[in-house]
From Swiss-Prot:
Residues 263-278, 299-323, 369-431, 485-507, 518-549 have a biased composition (Basic and acidic residues). Keywords: Initiation factor, Nucleus, Phosphoprotein, Protein biosynthesis. Homodimer. Nonspherical monomer. mRNA-discriminating component of initiation complexes. Belongs to the eIF-4 subunit B family. It is found in: Nucleus. A motif (Nuclear localization signal 1) lies at residues 169-176. Over-expression in sns-D leads to programmed cell death (PCD) in the leaves characterized by spontaneous necrotic spots on the rosette leaves under aseptic conditions. Embryo lethal when homozygote. Transmembrane segments: none annotated. InterPro entries: EIF-4B_pln. It comes from Arabidopsis thaliana (Mouse-ear cress). This is Eukaryotic translation initiation factor 4B2. The lineage of its organism: Eukaryota, Viridiplantae, Streptophyta, Embryophyta, Tracheophyta. Residues 96-109, 126-136, 184-218 have a biased composition (Gly residues).
Length: 549
């Protein structure tokens, strides 16, 4: 009977067997991860110093290793499709959506087979129109569900590949009225999601399918270049609100015919020409007279002169000639009447013309005022003498001995002339002598007065235009020359350190003393401060020299 825990040493055999299995697994994993070793192995592995040798051609060309491509197995090859998938009858319906969209929008309405036929005579040309059109979005109006679906046109060839020149097969544009018969692109009423076969082209109309099967025939989209001309107004969603039809491009009276008849256009309105323009053109004077003229009854000067038989050009030339001889005409003397005179009547205009011929006298802006010289001459006074006396009064100076003597002589001659005129002549001889003396005295008086005036003018000019020495604050050389009238002080005295800028005081009458007076105390103070250091130094130097001597 075998023991349940096995024989002696069985655990050792199991341990060895487990070690062998682990070693086999380790070798297998090492072989797999040889190209990509782990970080630990890469860190522990030591690269040999001796590198592998290779030729230059092997280095340049490189060793080509073909990509290892694992092919498909037999089972996978058998599972691959060998043809198109077999479709059911529902999927083969014309308007059926494929893929995950097969159940979108509910059922489809029944219609003829074919994919979006080019010929849409019996069906609506817009989306979801009557007669087999596409169902409305989301499956509205589920009561009219049909089996209309798309046609599977996979084996068909595209017409774009058949024709190289697409413009050859393009039809000529139809007339505007033909394209309007019935509904646009073969439809009649209808709206989004609306029912009713043969409904007009609005989005989502229910009814029959959207196109006939097959690929033959031209589309009306190719016949019309301007699609916006027949565009219908977008209607509301759902079947609750419906429209009677598309909005027409031209207005028409009455109800539109539903049987596709030709619409009658409204007649053009023929307007008669406006009568107001003709009346205005025929009677322009009546319109002008309605507004009062700002110039009143005044007329141009040329017309007035022409009525009087005068040549206005000749009058203007005469006036200009007269003005050129006298002086430059002012603005008040212009040949044409001013704007202020234009509102007068014809008589006033003629008077103005006559007045214009005679130049107006110039008005003196000063009135009756006359110059001072003219008035003094009329009064018998000499204005030059008066001016000289006034100028002499402005100069403040004492009277000299020469002036006093000339004045006394003039006074004596005047008294003598008055006495001779007062005493009547007793004899003819005395009368002749008095006449000669009487003629000589006025000449002497005039000569004396002339000499006195010249003397006074010279003395006044000397006082007024006397040169004044301008002393600089730091110049000591000009100081001594400018104060020639000042009494000299002793050499080395303290007065040399004081500099007072002064000018000659005007002498009063009867006194000839000249007293200096300061001009600018502030300037004197600054000058004394500036020169104080140097003057004190010179003073110390002179005092030390005295002590040394």
């Amino acid at each position: 009977m075998s023991k349940p825990w096995g024989g002696i040493g069985a655990w050792a055999d199991e341990a060895e067997r487990a070690d062998e299995e682990q070693a086999a697994e380790a070798t297998a994993t090492a072989a797999d991860s040889q190209s990509f070793p782990s970080l630990k192995e890469a860190a522990t592995a030591k690269s040999s110093k001796k590198k592998k040798k290779m030729t230059l051609s092997e280095f340049t060309k490189g060793a080509y290793t073909a990509p290892s491509s694992a092919g498909l197995t037999r089972e996978q090859m058998l599972q691959l499709p060998t043809g198109p998938r077999q479709r059911s009858e529902d999927e083969m319906q014309p308007g059926r959506l494929g893929g995950g969209f097969s159940s979108y929008g509910g059922g489809r309405s029944s219609g003829p087979p074919g994919r979006m036929s080019r010929d849409r005579e019996d069906s609506d040309g817009s989306w979801g129109g009557g007669g087999g059109g596409r169902r409305s979005y989301g499956g509205f109006d589920d009561d009219q569900r049909g089996s209309n679906s798309r046609v599977s046109d996979f084996p068909q060839v595209s017409r774009a590949d058949e024709d190289d020149d697409w413009g050859k097969g393009k039809k000529s544009l139809p007339s505007f009225d033909q394209g309007r018969q019935g509904s646009r692109y073969g439809g009649g009423g209808g709206s989004f999601g609306g029912g009713g076969g043969g409904g007009a082209g609005s989005y989502g109309g229910g009814g029959a399918g959207a196109g006939s099967g097959g690929g033959g025939g031209f589309s009306k989209a190719d016949e019309v270049d301007n699609w916006a001309a027949g565009k219908a107004k977008s209607s509301t969603f759902g079947s609750g609100f419906r429209e009677s039809g598309p909005e027409p491009d031209r207005w028409a009276r009455g109800v539109l015919p539903s049987g596709g008849g030709v619409q009658e256009e409204r007649r053009r309105l023929v307007f008669e020409p406006r009568k107001a323009d003709t009346e205005v053109s025929e009677t322009p004077t009546a319109v002008k007279t309605s507004k009062p003229s700002p110039f009143g009854a005044a007329r141009p000067r040329e017309q007035v002169l022409a009525e009087k038989g005068l040549d206005w050009k000749k009058l203007d030339s005469d006036i200009e000639a007269k003005k050129g001889q006298t002086s430059r005409p002012s603005s008040a003397q212009s040949s044409r009447p001013s704007s202020a005179q234009s509102n007068r009547s014809e008589s006033s205009a003629l008077n103005n013309v006559e007045n214009v011929v005679k130049p107006r006298p110039k008005v003196n802006p000063f009135g009756d005022a006359k110059p001072r010289e003219v008035l003094l001459e009329e009064q018998g006074k000499d204005w030059r003498k008066i001016d000289s006396e006034l100028e002499h009064r402005r100069v403040d100076r004492p009277e000299t001995e020469g002036e006093r003597m000339l004045k006394e002589e003039i006074e004596e001659l005047r008294k003598k002339l008055e006495k001779e005129a007062a005493i009547a002549p007793e004899s003819k001889e005395s009368q002749q002598e008095s006449d000669s003396n009487h003629q000589n005295l006025p000449d002497l008086i005039r000569e004396k007065e002339k000499n006195l005036d010249l003397l006074i003018r010279e003395l006044d000019d000397k006082v007024r235009f006397r040169p004044r020495a301008v002393e600089r604050p730091g110049s000591s050389a000009s100081r001594g020359g400018s104060y020639s009238e000042r009494p000299h002080s002793r050499a080395g005295s303290i007065d040399e350190s004081r500099s007072v800028e002064s000018m000659e005081r005007p002498r009063s009458h009867g006194t000839g003393d000249n007293w200096p007076r300061p001009v600018d105390d502030r300037r004197n103070f600054q000058g004394s401060k500036e020169r104080g250091f140097f003057n004190n130094r010179n003073f110390d130097r002179s005092s030390s020299a005295r002590e040394g001597w």
